[in-house]
Amino acid sequence: MSFNTFGHMFRVTTFGESHGVAIGCVVDGCPPRIPLEAAEIQTDLDRRRPGQSRFTTQRQEPDQVKILSGVMADPDTGAQVTTGTPIALLIENTDQRSKDYSEIKDKFRPGHADFTYEAKYGLRDYRGGGRSSARETATRVAAGAIARKIIAGVKVRGALVQMGPHKIDRDKWDWDEIARNPFFCPDKDKAAFFEDYLDGIRKSGSSIGAVLEITAEGVPAGLGAPLYGKLDADLAAAMMSINAVKGVEIGAGFGAAELTGEANADEMRSANDGTRFLSNHAGGILGGIATGQPIVVRFAVKPTSSILTPRQTVDRAGHETEILTKGRHDPCVGIRAVPVGEAMMACVLADHLLRHRGQVG
């Protein structure tokens, strides 16, 4: 199985399966002498960690990260810093329950990657989905914590802005509210609504999708490249690579199709510190290159495929049958995808920053 590596100058290779001994990643391209402690990575991992509320999977994984290589004590300060060599990170799996999946080892779950993995490789890891499981995203969050150190000064944040058909009120957006509820929701009133809404879905054994918004403030103008090295193209690819993501938009996104040229164009004026934009329909990127405005990316996450409702399917022999999925699953996988989206944003920006330095100095 190839294609486990993401990035060009800042490269992340992930490994491991949902029910294997461990998962992890190797980060290549991190500059030397950047202060880095496991506790800094752990902070980001704890935001994504499962089992923290009734609205996420009850699989209990501490997600304790170990730094295996790529760091040492700075000879001048004594602080632990990166060496410039590959950084290997390991997260042990501790709460696998593979027996929950024994009844579906020969059946394909509708909406899941079971069928396509079998079609490509001739077999699949039915125990929690193997590499196709969202368990893999913990390694992305770990890599993203390192990327954040490279892009110090850039603020990357994310929020859940829609669950099912229910959208937040953007006039009530409060970044501080995100840490106060289990949904990463910036709208206090809508977060309270989501509690009852998702409780009903969870108790019925079903699931629901969501829309997440990731922003990056402080990105310098000029980051990115034209044509085949576009910053927005890499961001779209990064977000689409996250499990269960089915759509990505930058700035106004698909809404731009409803605007006139006058409404869509972000007009510019002169300011004391440079150029000032009067709007941000472009989402901070024009021609594949950052404008200096906040970068705004949204992505849609489909409902979790593993649900308790019986569904029609076929088995490996091609026989028609019925399937009911047991195990522990997120009723809305979009909730824990917020830190994952932030991590992918950080990784792309770190990669482009290093590429930018290599091209223009």
Swiss-Prot record:
Taxonomy, superkingdom: Bacteria
Family recorded in the similarity comment: Belongs to the chorismate synthase family.
GO terms, biological process: amino acid biosynthetic process; aromatic amino acid family biosynthetic process; chorismate biosynthetic process
Residues that bind NADP(+): 48, 54
Required cofactor(s): FMNH2
HAMAP family reported in the protein's UniProt record: Chorismate_synth
One term under GO cellular component: cytosol
Binding site for FMN: 131-133, 243-244, 287, 302-306, 328
Species per Swiss-Prot/TrEMBL record: Bradyrhizobium sp. (strain ORS 278)
Protein name: Chorismate synthase
Keyword ATP-binding carried by entry: no
Function: This reaction introduces a second double bond into the aromatic ring system.
InterPro entries: Chorismate_synth (IPR000453), Chorismate_synth_AroC_sf (IPR035904), Chorismate_synthase_CS (IPR020541)
